[in-house]
Amino acid sequence: MSRRCELTAKAPLVGHKVSHSNIKTKRRFLPNLVNVTFVSETLSSSVRFRVSTHALRSVDHRGGFDAFLLKARDSELSPKAIELKRQIQKKQAAKAG
């Protein structure tokens, strides 16, 4: 299981832990990942993702899970999220047309 957000592609960063005497030792800054179940209103189904808490705020800000996926870049999404995005686009196109 990778330590990468499936919606925003946040990944671990590398830096230094600096002591009072300025001795630097390598450390990793890990993203705050949580397992969340999102409900797609368009598909009428629920989907589980491992996302950062930053992504949770972004989903709320953009008006829900479906709206977030439709506005998100494919380069940031996981393959599972891209497939879901395509399904939502097809369903909305069929509904509109």
Swiss-Prot record:
Keywords: Ribonucleoprotein, Ribosomal protein. InterPro entries: Ribosomal_bL28, Ribosomal_bL28/bL31-like_sf, Ribosomal_bL28_bact-type, Ribosomal_bL28_sf. One of its GO terms (cellular component) is cytosolic large ribosomal subunit. Gene3D superfamilies: Ribosomal protein L28/L24. One of its GO terms (biological process) is translation. It comes from the Bacteria. Pfam families: Ribosomal_L28. One of its GO terms (molecular function) is structural constituent of ribosome. Belongs to the bacterial ribosomal protein bL28 family. This is Large ribosomal subunit protein bL28. It comes from Nitrobacter winogradskyi (strain ATCC 25391 / DSM 10237 / CIP 104748 / NCIMB 11846 / Nb-255). The lineage of its organism: Bacteria, Pseudomonadati, Pseudomonadota, Alphaproteobacteria, Hyphomicrobiales.
